[in-house]
Every structure is written in structure tokens, then in C-alpha cells.
């Protein structure tokens, strides 16, 4: 029971680290820095990994992080789909930078498949196959003029 409590606490802390890192990396899009530098998906993932490396094993292996950046025109309904289907992380995921100064709404999502170790004795918080828990962070914003 003690190990389950510790694992749950670490999981919640890791979720907060991912939220903060995603918010800071998404700010690069909100303030035009990503657009001005032509930041591609790999560069965005690298920036995010540099911000969360204290808790996450994604530095040097960007496959552990999945990002989804979608741009919505003003007045358009924002539809976000559940990334988990039948215990697997599924897309479609995209990466599209908003035009600088556009009135569009941008939604940035970051996902990390966190491995779980205490999954027996009736305590199993996995929501992915392979005893993993999907950690997700979302930032939504309008690009600064």
C-alpha cells in the first residue's frame, strides 16, 4: 500500500511538471517566438523536454513525448478528441503553427506514457496497455497581436 501511495504522489507531481512545461513551451507560440524562428515539431519537443527533464525520460528520445498543436479560426467550434482508444494512444495528431498576430485559438496538447510499477493487489491506475498511464497537458490561447 505504501508503494501505491508513493507512486500515485509521484504521478501527480509528474503531471504538474508536464503542465508547467507545456504552458511555458506553448508561450513561445503565443508570443511569436516559435513562428519567427520557424520552430518545427522536433524543435518544440526538444524545448519541452528541456523544461521537463527533471521528471521525464525524453531527452535524446523524443518518441516518448507526443504533441498535438491545432489552430482554430474565430467562431469555429473547438473539438478535441480523446487520445486513448482501446488502451492505445491514437491520433490524429498534428503540428501547425498559427500565423503571427492571427485572431485564431490555438490548442497545444502534450502526452507522455508514464510507466507504472504498482499495478497488482487491486490497485491499477493504468489507462494504456502495458501498465502505463497517459499524462496529458493542455494549453489554449490566442496569439498575441
Model segments located where?
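Extracellular/periplasmic head regions of type IV pilus-like filament subunits
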Residues: 37-76
